[in-house]
């Protein structure tokens, strides 16, 4: 089902969520710079929000010893973190130094959807009843979900309007 809203409370909650996402990305870029080696931060996104998951190194190069990092696997989103156990004795000093750098620079912002979901008339069950997709074009938030939002929060629309708005959002974001 497709919906849209231009409710001021929903727009305010959307703006806060996007501001938190931007702050999270800025914190992650800082960590990427500190670690070097071309690493890129990896994020996790769920119905609860968006948060830092780990870092991904494109090659074999790592800051400090390679043995101090967990293995990048598809199960971990191809990300890694500094090891916290089974550190070889000869690398413990490096591990402490890496842990200090990690703790001082790891992104702490969690872009939560706690205010956004109720403003849209949705709750956690939105994920149980099917997919959830949302985006904003101007002062209108468009939502595709398998559940019906709380009464009066959003207006149901046809898929054609949703798809047109989706294409407009892609153009606005520079994707074509």
From Swiss-Prot:
Protein's UniProt name: Uncharacterized protein gp12
Induction, as annotated: Expressed in the early phase of the viral replicative cycle. Expression of early genes is repressed by viral Repc (latency) and favored by viral Ner protein.
Species the sequence originates in: Escherichia phage Mu (Bacteriophage Mu)
Subcellular location per the Swiss-Prot or TrEMBL entry: Host cytoplasm
Keywords tagged on the record: Early protein, Host cytoplasm
CC per GO annotation: host cell cytoplasm
